[in-house]
Amino acid sequence: MNQNILSRSACNALRGLAIIGIFLHNYCHWLGPIVKENEYQFFQHNADWLLQVMANPDINLPIHLLSFFGHYGVPVFLFLSAYGLVMKYEAKPHLSADQQAQMYNISGRKQSWSISWREPLRFIRYHYLKLFKMMIVGFIAFTMIDYITPGARHYEVLGIVSMLGMFNNVLPNPDNIIWPGPYWFFGLMLQLYIVYRLLLYRRHWGWTAGLMLLCIGIQLLLGFDNPESEAMNRYRYNFMGGMLPFGLGILYARYGEKILMTFHSPVTNIFGCVFCISLIYSLSLNMIGWTFVPFFICLLCVLVADLLQEVSWLSGIYKVLEWIGVISAALFVTHPITRKIFIPISRHGDIYAGLLLYIIASIGIAWLFTQLMKKIPNPKS
């Protein structure tokens, strides 16, 4: 087990960076003339549109870039969630030294362990309730705001029940069921918690690597057939589409720089960041490369974490990102509320005024909701 690769403050700073990308993306991609992303499916015309915008930049270039790339905050969250699971549940010293060596040495063999089915169910129940506690406050507030503002959603019983039960991702046409859209993440996380506990928890590294390769392979097959298909859409709405960054988080927590290398030199890390950003941009322009972008997103976030901690003049940015990371859960569940209110300003022509009001209101409300969520008792493990 690799110890203290990412500190708690570094994880919070990366959560802050990730949620900034997510909540700005979820505003910008709603604007008609702005480049659209390839999040669940790969549309070549979206990649070509980005190239056209980069060749002829205008005042809206930052909006285009946030719309196209901002959703990659989700893989960062998956990476950090997996990292946190391993550090919480696998770093505890309840195995002998020999057992630890066999379990975590990359070349070692896994021992077989007999466990009661009750413990995995308790684990899944605990994490479902944690997600529910986070989601329900924002969902209640959003549905009320949605009802009293123009363009209210017509909810159906199945949509509501599946949202609260977090199984909406597996239903047909998830785009038409999940509302607000960002809440698809809760169903995804619940699936990954189940996969982790039943298949990957304290298992040989080959289980994680094998599942990653299997999910990537199936996605490539779907992409070669039709990357714009509904089959690809449904596939990436579920745990298979997030297995690459989630698996990397597990392996990085266990083996550290054997998986994702940092250089412990600010100058070298800066070059590493530039290299990753260049690769992310170029790989995003074709279907095969797009499949592997989350790997370089995870590598970039590790390099950024190392850089922020190494360079003293970045300490102010580091502290701001760390604070945003602390309120990231509340910001995630509440930003659809402020988006619904302020998006008309940007749609009617004043893009940056609407965006600025949205940012200010979202962060303020997220801080308030963070205080509110502290009042809700945590589930018992």
Regions found by a protein language model. Name each.
Residues 1-216, 347-381:
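Membrane-cytosol interface segments of multi-pass membrane proteins
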Residues 25-26, 332-335:
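Histidine-centered divalent metal-coordination motifs
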Residues 219-330, 337-358:
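Alpha-helical transmembrane segments and terminal signal-anchor/GPI-anchor hydrophobic tails
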